[in-house]
């Protein structure tokens, strides 16, 4: 394979990857109208969201999971505006004015997408997991197994993460932010 052919193959891969990634992000946002006009508007919405999430240090898993409830609220209550309502999703942001501006753009996108609100929430909850394995969760399970020969935490995590999209009301604590001490956990490729 020549260098030009390799560059061409890499370019094709990048275009395919970007297309699928963008499609997945639209689904995570509950936007299923894939017309070219909607896709272009959704691209602007997604890019501004990614910047907003990064600037505000928002936990992506928590954001995307809570977004389905926010979308339902935006679609079912015409009087609702994020600026007037303290919502759990809004509370994730330090810059609430920026979130409010994004939320207004998001509502416009939802209004152009014909999917019924409750069905949208169900579809979003099936693509946005509530639970992911976080370093601190693995650390607790490892420490219990090593120091106490107690494998119950591993079993519990295995069961929980086997169905990460389900609510698991008795396991809500695993869906929250990591504890402060977890910032000190260091993971390497040889761990």
Describe each PLM feature range.
Residues 1-191:
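Regulatory N- and C-terminal appendages and interdomain linkers associated
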